[in-house]
């Protein structure tokens, strides 16, 4: 990528669990960072992703991403440079979402984009965790959106509840 610069923005889509060293290695190569910011709660991060340090690692990684790309630039409805952070609101975990949004508000500026997703469908091993073995309630999602607005996020992608449909889950074949 250092030799070849494509005519379209280079996008780094990631889970947010990258080290600052990994992000530093990408400096000057990435136009748009698109990380997840899954957890502010270390207990949830430990239970669902076996990564109790996820909140601190993700916050540091996203801050490093923001420092590299600076102000988010959108032209003709297309992101050219910047930061688009995704967060999936989990059922029964609105406090986790509030914590993610609070942490993100310390990093982001008014140009950055937040994708607040409502598409959670209990699948796979969700039955092992009764607290997330259900769909998101409309009031939980509304509370999350309201908190984002209260914090001053101006560019928020929101979803209809119909996006939480098993039809959107790919068939994962085990080999």
Give residue spans per PLM region.
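Auxiliary Fe-S-binding modules of radical SAM enzymes
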Residues: 70-175
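Core AdoMet radical
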Residues: 1-72, 157-159
